């Protein structure tokens, strides 16, 4: 068997096989005899054709025999060639240039298939301490103030106004929202009863806030709201007005939030530390994402099309499941193609790096991680155990642990050159 291999690109192989009749004669006869053994002809027992009956049968069924041999030969010789050349395909493969005319003729075909590309020599020299630039945001007192305000809202109480109480910005109302037609008349079935909103927040700011200020229980306010379908008029009848009473930030409030703390200063310090920890983690995430971008950009190779197509199909199904109405596959096609290509490229690069750096994940590590989670949250022990009994969830945990070990290793090869930026500067830019 003559085997010729041509690399179409990094991930696509053209395999050409040529076999002389002498090499395939025995296999051809085996196929022919198998067909003869199951043949049924008048005047002869099943599989017992002799003489002229056999000759006539073979003549009449030669195309059928040839077709069966080709099916057998393609699979058999292709498999032998792969074993001989130690090649592992990752897709079905497409056959072309098939040449075989039956008895006494040679057999030749070409098959195109994909492989996982060999990228060892394409990986950049990352061991030279590559510098990655990132932004490192620093928490400020205004972050702490915002966190405390959010916490005060969580512990707030509501005070209802009497009929004389006037509505102020920041108050909540319970009101009937009735849609009006072009003539200003109520639309039948167009009332949203006792809807709860906060005046001075979200939609009800600016021009939509002003008509409500100083109104009382029982008053009706007419407003015009910009919606997707156009401007819509509403009559809003106020049924109830509530004022949000925020707790004072003092020692009593501190005790409610965290019984281990004693002073407001301690609470602010803890909040700031937690906020900074989150910002530090965001910086680390940015650092790792830029390491990924570095490898994707610097490692040049052709990604297997079938792997990209399969990942793209997964993305499409995932988007459809999450929000079928909003998802437009045709519109998102360029992004889907780019995301799929990048993810598969990174999958193959990381696979190579994990092997090169001998990053190993033992089964005990996964089980120990699950045990640690159960020990940390004993009240949820049964739920945690049940969750990780599902193979899909355990595989995700395995991937997370492997990813953590991988980036711990990569951290030693890359320098995170941070630019410290106070979060106040970001807020000022947005403002």
Model-found features: residue ranges?
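FKBP-type peptidyl-prolyl cis-trans isomerases
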Residues: 1-431
